[in-house]
């Protein structure tokens, strides 16, 4: 089994017998569809401080060679609730994190460290998304709200 899938299993994903894994490319984006994986929710119902988020993310970001991690959304605006997810913008430039599987392992490791659901978008994906006229505002909002919670420099 590939190392990336082993990492999914390590973080609570369960392989269902006869599961299928589909992979395709669309507009130069590597798309992976996993049919038969489900992850049980074991989240912490609390509001983390920015410092706590930094402390939990740093070891994972360093392990993967991530350049920077930014917080946006309700946590960055100071509006987080106990059931809020954590929105992260990750700069993966200069890393080997190019496939959905490798990004998936990063996602799983960060989510495990935080013990809360996360939404993760890379800087390059944000740039691509912003090229669509209906999505320009999303990029502007993320860039305005973002708080640096990890910097490799």
Language-model-derived ranges and their functions:
Residues 74:
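P-loop (Walker A) phosphate-binding loop of NTP-binding proteins
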Residues 71, 86-88:
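A structural signal for short, well-ordered beta-strand segments
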Residues 25-68, 77-78, 82, 93-153:
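Catalytic core of pol beta-like nucleotidyltransferases
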């Amino acid at each position: 089994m590939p190392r990336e899938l082993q990492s999914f299993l390590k973080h609570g994903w369960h392989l269902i017998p006869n599961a299928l894994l589909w992979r395709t490319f669309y507009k130069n984006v590597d798309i992976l569809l996993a049919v038969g994986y489900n992850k049980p929710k074991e989240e912490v119902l609390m509001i983390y401080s920015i410092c706590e988020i930094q402390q939990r993310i740093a070891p994972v970001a360093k392990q993967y060679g991530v350049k920077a991690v930014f917080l946006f959304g309700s946590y960055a605006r100071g509006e987080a609730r106990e059931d809020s997810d954590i929105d992260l913008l990750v700069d993966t430039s200069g890393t080997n994190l190019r496939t959905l599987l490798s990004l998936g392992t990063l996602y799983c490791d960060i989510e495990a460290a935080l013990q809360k659901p996360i939404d993760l978008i890379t800087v390059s994906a944000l740039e691509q998304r912003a090229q669509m006229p209906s999505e320009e505002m999303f990029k502007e909002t993320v860039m305005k709200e973002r708080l640096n919670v990890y910097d490799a420099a």
